[in-house]
Design a protein with these regions (language model features):
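ABC ATP-binding cassette signature C-motif
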Residues: 1-195
Length: 195
């Protein structure tokens, strides 16, 4: 993924935060979208427990229902009732993902979800995403996260979004080969200039 290629613009169009300059964006009127970023866990009051935070977001739920729901995301027992400041980064991310999943979105858009997370936290998030039964759209530079959560690869660049036929390893090989060819062309141009 190349910075400045238009990934954020694409996500903002998907999330209806931007209007396209030309063309259109169509979505079903009942489509529920969720949005998960590297900062999603920062929205909680860390003095409160995961259960208390969830109940604050969803006041129509009861304590037992929320604890049971959090358990589906491996936030169980004491972890669900102790202050969130005592949870690991991965646990906080799982609580954030649980809060998002509780809203039952059809599709969750992930914007660099693993930035600033350690491997244990990334693996915890990967596990939660694998258990999710809706659609996902991921924008990430994290090969490990993408390889373990995505079944299709779409490339953003040159003002287009196109499906890449193959997995992440094939994409890397293809990108390296294109880069190698560009470097060879540049070297030839420079050598011709220096003659």
């Amino acid at each position: 993924m190349i910075d400045g290629a238009g990934k954020s613009t694409l996500l903002n169009l998907i999330m209806d935060k931007l209007t396209p300059c030309r063309g259109s964006v169509s979505r079903h009127g009942n489509l529920r979208l969720g949005y998960f970023t590297q900062h999603s866990a920062d929205t909680f009051d860390l003095r409160l427990s995961a259960t208390e935070n969830m109940l604050a977001k969803f006041p129509n739920a009861d304590d037992q229902e929320m604890r049971s729901f959090l358990g589906k995301f491996q936030i169980q027992g004491q972890d669900s009732v102790k202050p969130m400041m005592m949870l690991s980064g991965g646990q906080k991310s799982r609580v954030a993902f649980a809060a998002l999943a509780y809203q039952k979105p059809h599709v969750i858009v992930f914007d660099e979800p693993s930035n600033h997370l350690d491997m244990e936290s990334i693996d915890a998030l990967v596990g939660a995403v694998k258990d999710y039964r809706g659609g996902i759209v991921v924008v990430s530079h994290d090969e490990h996260f993408m390889s373990n959560t995505c079944s299709e690869l779409w490339v953003v660049g040159d003002g287009k979004v196109s499906r890449f036929r193959g997995g992440f390893n094939e994409y890397k090989k293809d990108t390296l080969e294109k880069t190698r060819k560009r470097i060879e062309q540049s070297v030839k141009l420079l050598s011709n200039i220096n003659k």
